[in-house]
Amino acid sequence: MEDYLEGLERAMRSMPAAKGTKERFQIPVPRIFYEGKTTVLDNFAAIADALNRDPDHLMKFLLQELGTAGKIEGHRGVFQGKFTEQAIQNQIAAYVDEYVICSECKLPDTHLIKSDRVLMLKCDACGAHRPVKKRKAKAVVARDVIEEGETYELRIESVGSKGDGIAKVDKYLIFVPNTSKGEIVKAKVKKISGTLAFAEIVERKGKA
């Protein structure tokens, strides 16, 4: 019996430690592109699902923090104005910190409840609960400038007379060779001349 217990103990010690919820918790990187004067968060639904939060609640927070208007269209989030991937990623991180992560055990196993009209974050892992803060809207400056050497996710809106695909980012027309209308691509801007920009494909993302 002692040999059995010793063998069992050795086996348990040799087993790798199970990964906790925190280690499994991964937030998708925001995938954005521009349509006219709007910013489209193409994987909005996937992000809300990963956070285990109501998409409407997440969207309301993002609109307030970005200081803009917008809506949910299917799996996408659409925002008025031009916002960088980093700007949106920063606000998602702020949402996670306030509405997802437990302040005691630092795990994401939480849910939102209302107690006496106060919105609370309750942790399923450790049982802790806390009120969430009422946040004031912050003015976030939307960027509409593209830069040489930078890579952007673009939606090809038309094809020029020479066969190059054309994407629009605010006042800029970006020419991307070997692309077709409706295609979404990642392209690196090689040259900017006035409001015209010339880019080359880095990756094809598919059709819109």
From Swiss-Prot:
Protein biosynthesis as UniProt keyword: yes
Spans through the membrane: none
The entry's keywords: Initiation factor, Protein biosynthesis
Molecular function per GO: translation initiation factor activity
Top-level taxon in the UniProt lineage: Archaea
A Pfam family annotated for this UniProt entry: eIF-5_eIF-2B
Signal peptide (UniProt feature, chain positions): none
Record-annotated TRAM domain positions: 145-203
InterPro entries: IF2/IF5, NA-bd_OB-fold, TIF2_bsu_arc, TRAM_dom, Transl_init_fac_IF2/IF5_dom, Transl_init_fac_IF2/IF5_N, Transl_init_fac_IF2/IF5_Zn-bd
Job of this protein: eIF-2 functions in the early steps of protein synthesis by forming a ternary complex with GTP and initiator tRNA.
Family label: Belongs to the eIF-2-beta/eIF-5 family.
PANTHER family membership: EUKARYOTIC TRANSLATION INITIATION FACTOR, EUKARYOTIC TRANSLATION INITIATION FACTOR 2 SUBUNIT 2
Subunit structure: Heterotrimer composed of an alpha, a beta and a gamma chain.
UniProt cross-references to HAMAP family, sorted A to Z: eIF_2_beta
Name recorded for this polypeptide: Translation initiation factor 2 subunit beta
Organism: Methanothrix thermoacetophila (strain DSM 6194 / JCM 14653 / NBRC 101360 / PT)
Organism placement in taxonomy: Archaea, Methanobacteriati, Methanobacteriota, Stenosarchaea group, Methanomicrobia
